[in-house]
Amino acid sequence: MNPPTVTVHDSTLRDGQHAVRHQLDADQIRAYAVAADTAGVPVLEVGHGNGIGASSRQVGLSKTDDATMLTTAREAMPHSRLATLMLPGWATSTDLRSAIRHGVDIVRVAAHCTEADVTERHLGVIRDLGAEAQGVLLMSHLAAPDELAAQCQRMVGYGAQAVCIFDSAGTYLPEDVTARITAITTAVDVPVAFHGHNNLGMAVANSLAAVRAGARVLDACARGFGAGAGNTQLEVLVAVLERYGHPTGIDLRLVAQAADLAERTLMPAPPTIDSTSLVSGLAGVFSGFKKPVLAAAQRAGVSPWDVFVELGRRRVLAGQEDLIPDAINTLTSMGERP
C-alpha cells in the first residue's frame, strides 16, 4: 500500500508574523509568495498573526493592512491556493467578504478547543461566498480526544470542509497527537489537519504521528518561522515526508531555497528552543506570550520561568496577555524572585 499524499499548508506569512510583531511588508510577502509558489507549495496562508481583522493595540498593530497582504500574495501566486485565518470576535463578516474578494481560496475559522459553536455563522458565510471553509481548534491540549472529536463534528455540521487542531503551546508528544487525531478521523469524514509548534523539539515527529493516525494536511513554516521556538519547519517536514514516501507535490530543493530566502528576508534569526520556549511548552502556554512575558518579568524582577508556570496554572489563552501583570503580582506577593 502506497503512503498517502500529504498536503502541506504553509503558514509562514501568517503564523510567522508573531515573531516580528506583525511587521511584514508587501515586498517581503511578495518575494516569499513567489518562492513558495515556484516550489510547488499547494497552500500559503497570509495575514496578521491573529488573523484578518485582528490588527489592534491589544494583540499588535500590523504594518501592512489585510487587503494589501492578501492582494500582494494572490498576485504573486499563479498556482498555490491562498488561505487566511480568522478568529470570531476579531474578524467580522465584512472582513470575510473583503478577504474572499481579494482572492482568498481557503478561510480557517479558529476557536478555543471547547468553543466550536462560535464558528457556526462564519463557516456558513464562507461557504455562501464560494470559498473553502475550514474549522480550527486552538489550545487543543486543553481538551480530551473525545471532546476534540465532538467539537470537530460540530464544525463539520456547520459546514467545515476540513478540520484542524493546533498544538498552540507546543506541548504535545507523539502519543498525544496519535490519540487526538485518531479520535477525530474516526468521528468526521472530512480532511483532518495538524498544526505543530516546536517548544519541546517534537514538531516534525508530532506531524508524522498525525499522518500515521489519519491526518492528511500538515501545517509548517519556513525555518519554523513563528513565535518562541517556532512552528514545524517546512523544509525539514517536506524532506522527512519524502523519505517516508509521502507525495507532497513540493520540490524539496526549491522549498529549501525558499526557506533560505525566508531566513534572509523575513526574520531577525531563526527560532530556537531557549529556556523560555521550553517552559512555555511544559506549562502549556501559547508561544506568543514569550516576548511580553520576558519584558514584564524583567521590569518586575521576577523569573520568566515562574511567570509561565503561573500562566499555565491559569490555563491562559492567546489574546489574554493582559493577565501577565496579574500573574506577576501573584508571584511577587509570594516572594518569588529570579
Curated annotation (Swiss-Prot):
Q: Enzyme class, one word?
A: lyase
**Sites marked Transition state stabilizer:** 14
Q: Transport: present as a keyword of the record?
A: no
Q: Which residues participate in substrate binding?
A: 14-15, 168, 195
- What are the protein's GO molecular function terms? 2-isopropylmalate synthase activity; 4-hydroxy-2-oxovalerate aldolase activity; manganese ion binding
Check the record and name the Gene3D superfamilies matching this protein. Answer: 1.10.8.60, Aldolase class I (3.20.20.70)
Q: Which residues form the Pyruvate carboxyltransferase domain?
A: 6-256
**InterPro entries according to UniProt:** 2-IPM_HCS-like (IPR050073), 4OH_2_O-val_aldolase (IPR017629), Aldolase_TIM (IPR013785), DmpG_comm (IPR012425), DRE_TIM_HOA (IPR035685), PYR_CT (IPR000891)
Q: Where is the active site?
A: 18 (proton acceptor)
Q: Which residues bind Mn(2+)?
A: 15, 195, 197
The text of the family note is: Belongs to the 4-hydroxy-2-oxovalerate aldolase family.
Q: What is this protein called?
A: 4-hydroxy-2-oxovalerate aldolase
